[in-house]
């Protein structure tokens, strides 16, 4: 009898060891699908709520409102009425994939309300019932097994709602219901359906996803694995998770997709396209929480956002979407933006954020696209390449519409209606690089300057040299050598937009025409939405006067007219400045002799010299040089000639980030910085 008892005890111990060994292995979705008994025990039993799962769920709830504020695609503060059949009224989510997406986003929005202590629906039992009922309704309609390379319903292109948003619904509903009687059911449904629709961190419905899509998929996948009892360490070793962690690591790359050494985000190989980054940014907090602070290049990503964004959500259009926008509803929540000037010397982006305004310019380089078109968006190339303006941070944000998107400050118009198409010749996206693209940037403590030489073959060989200076409360802009393909304008004069007014928005500003009449028939000083424009005369340049025009009833413009004859000979000029309303300055600009040298002084300690290919910027005791040719050595003759041109020939200086090299100075490190910095010592 004792021997039999001992044998039985050994069998029990052996069974426990085998079970423990199996439970430590990564999820096997094939065996999950084949083994009904294992599926019932594993997917519909109570959640294995270990320490890591509990800690993650608690942290998720504590940070939900903050992270939700960083999420671009969402329904915030939903009030839509609930419906027993369709989850919400006036939707058809079981036949329309778009409506299904709306249901998903609305459920997540209600989860945020349920979780927010100050909300009237905080921990509402009725809302908790509605949330679990919504989850049940989704589960009742989803195909099991999932379709292969096809959306459960609707067009194949609508896979996104089922692969990206739906798993986030399962995760969010489950976590916010953790202290309710519904939690075990929600957790069981999440384990089951995520195993089907997210079998790995990078696959769904037969497709393998990468980049921004994989970033989104990885978080609910990892949560599903936590629910199954796996540790974060085990989850991190799975091949799909490893693949995603390599993506979110954002190592610096010299070319192609990812974060370039000067912290500009590149997508589609050569496009400054921040869309994926903006849509996925909120996930980085989850990855660092689950897998450690070092799994994400937080420093580089922070700089990438600072390089283009603002607290108000205004972003220079040249890094945004193909349909033309200057605004992100979430980027202002990503980082704490310092008052600073940022320059990306290799990717050619200059940004200034002051107390009073945000301004940025995207320059040109043959390494990167100046525009990306697709079959339905092909008219924003001028917006991406020529936006030259500031936005008053105390004024309202007015985004573009179909009537205004062609008429931004700085755009060189080749027709009266502003339409200039650069179409894709493929069925997908197509990027276009400049035929000539050379840019120098310089920044000091409060000022930034950018010198651009560009030619764009697809825009009638439009070419120009552009000189921009950002300084306290204002921006200076000069175009010279503006030209196009001869005889391409039908002998119609070109125009440069100085200031644009959206007439559908009431800002209490008078029309430009009324302001002109009230100012002795002069448009100098015309204002809209907190920004004032002025013509800037320059010695030895024929700078056009400011004129007013209304291309349609929806938009009114202050412009400078440039003759088609001058554009045909690449000799057209335009020059203006923009100031924050309520501020003025004593800015002056001079052409030195008849050379290609322009000296600009603000009268308040900032001086810029645009001496193509060299750019110099001086502020107080700091002086910076950069070459549009990206030279690694600045000759002493360039420095001395620049100081003479700004009437300070006797300046003594010491190198800061460069060293004496023959008859010039060589940069210490040119990996991401191409600006030569000097300190004035007398």
Swiss-Prot record:
Q: Which organism is it from?
A: Orgyia pseudotsugata multicapsid polyhedrosis virus
Concerning its family, UniProt says: Belongs to the baculoviridae E66 family.
Question: Could you identify this protein by its name?
Answer: Occlusion-derived virus envelope protein E66
Q: Does the keyword DNA damage apply?
A: no
Query: What's the stated role of this polypeptide?
Result: Component of the polyhedra envelope.
Task: Give the UniProt subcellular location, in the record's own words.
Answer: Virion membrane
Record SUPFAM superfamilies: Chondroitin AC/alginate lyase (SSF48230)
Chain segments annotated as coiled-coil in the UniProt record: none
């Amino acid at each position: 009898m004792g021997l039999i008892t001992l044998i039985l005890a050994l069998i029990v111990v052996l069974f426990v060891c085998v079970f423990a060994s199996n439970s430590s292995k990564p999820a096997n979705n094939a065996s999950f699908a084949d083994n009904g008994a294992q599926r019932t025990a594993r997917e519909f039993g109570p959640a294995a709520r270990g320490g890591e799962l509990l800690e993650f769920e608690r942290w998720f709830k504590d940070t939900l409102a903050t992270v939700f504020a960083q999420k671009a695609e969402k329904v915030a503060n939903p009030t839509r009425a609930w419906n027993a059949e369709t989850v919400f009224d006036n939707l058809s989510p079981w036949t329309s994939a778009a409506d299904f997406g709306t249901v998903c986003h609305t459920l997540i929005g209600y989860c945020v309300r349920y979780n927010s202590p100050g909300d009237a629906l905080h921990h509402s039992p009725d809302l908790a019932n509605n949330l679990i009922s919504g989850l049940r309704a989704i589960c009742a309609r989803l195909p099991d097994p999932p379709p292969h390379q096809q959306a459960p319903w609707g067009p194949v292109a609508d896979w996104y709602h089922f692969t990206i948003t739906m798993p986030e619904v399962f995760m969010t509903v489950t976590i916010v219901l953790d202290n309710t009687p519904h939690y075990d059911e929600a957790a069981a449904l999440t384990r089951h359906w995520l195993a089907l629709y997210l079998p790995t961190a990078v696959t769904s419905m037969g497709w393998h996803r990468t980049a921004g899509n994989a970033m989104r998929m990885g978080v609910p996948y990892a949560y599903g694995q936590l629910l199954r009892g796996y540790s974060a360490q085990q989850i991190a070793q799975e091949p799909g998770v490893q693949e995603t962690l390599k993506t979110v690591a954002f190592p610096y790359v010299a070319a192609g997709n990812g974060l370039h050494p000067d912290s500009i985000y590149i997508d589609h190989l050569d496009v400054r396209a921040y869309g994926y980054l903006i849509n996925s940014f909120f996930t980085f907090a989850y990855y660092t929480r689950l897998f450690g602070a070092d799994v994400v290049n937080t420093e580089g990503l922070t700089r990438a956002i600072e390089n283009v964004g603002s607290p108000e959500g205004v972003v220079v259009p040249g890094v945004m979407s193909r349909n033309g926008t200057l605004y992100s509803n979430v980027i202002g929540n990503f980082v704490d933006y310092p008052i600073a000037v940022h320059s990306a010397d290799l990717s050619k982006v200059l940004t200034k954020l002051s107390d009073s305004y945000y301004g940025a310019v995207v320059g040109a380089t043959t390494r990167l696209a100046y525009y990306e078109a697709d079959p339905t968006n092909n008219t924003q190339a001028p917006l991406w390449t020529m936006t030259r303006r500031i936005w008053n941070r105390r004024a309202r944000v007015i985004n573009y519409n179909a009537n205004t998107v062609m008429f931004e400050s700085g755009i060189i118009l080749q027709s009266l209606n502003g339409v200039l198409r650069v179409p894709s010749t493929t069925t997908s996206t197509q990027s276009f690089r400049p035929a000539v693209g050379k840019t120098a940037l310089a920044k000091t403590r409060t000022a930034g300057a950018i010198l651009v030489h560009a030619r764009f073959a697809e825009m009638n060989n439009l070419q120009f040299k552009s000189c921009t200076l950002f300084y306290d409360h204002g921006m200076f802009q000069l175009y010279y050598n503006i030209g196009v393909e001869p005889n391409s304008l039908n002998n119609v004069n070109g125009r440069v937009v100085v200031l644009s007014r959206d007439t559908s928005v009431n800002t209490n500003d008078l029309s430009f025409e009324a302001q002109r009449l009230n100012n002795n028939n002069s448009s100098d000083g015309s204002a809209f939405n907190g920004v004032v424009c002025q013509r800037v005369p320059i010695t030895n340049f024929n700078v056009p006067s400011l004129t007013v025009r209304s291309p349609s009833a929806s938009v009114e413009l202050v412009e400078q007219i440039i003759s088609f004859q001058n554009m045909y000979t690449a000799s057209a000029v335009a020059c203006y400045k923009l100031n924050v309303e309520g501020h003025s300055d004593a800015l002056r600009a001079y052409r030195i002799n008849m050379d290609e040298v322009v000296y600009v002084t603000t009268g308040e300690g900032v001086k810029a010299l645009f001496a193509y290919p060299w750019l110099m910027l001086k502020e107080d005791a700091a002086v910076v040089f950069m070459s549009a040719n990206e030279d690694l050595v600045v000759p002493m003759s360039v420095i001395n000639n620049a100081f003479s041109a700004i009437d300070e020939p006797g300046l003594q200086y010491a190198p800061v980030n460069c060293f004496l090299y023959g008859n010039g100075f060589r940069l210490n490190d040119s990996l991401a910085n191409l600006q030569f910095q000097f300190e004035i010592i007398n």
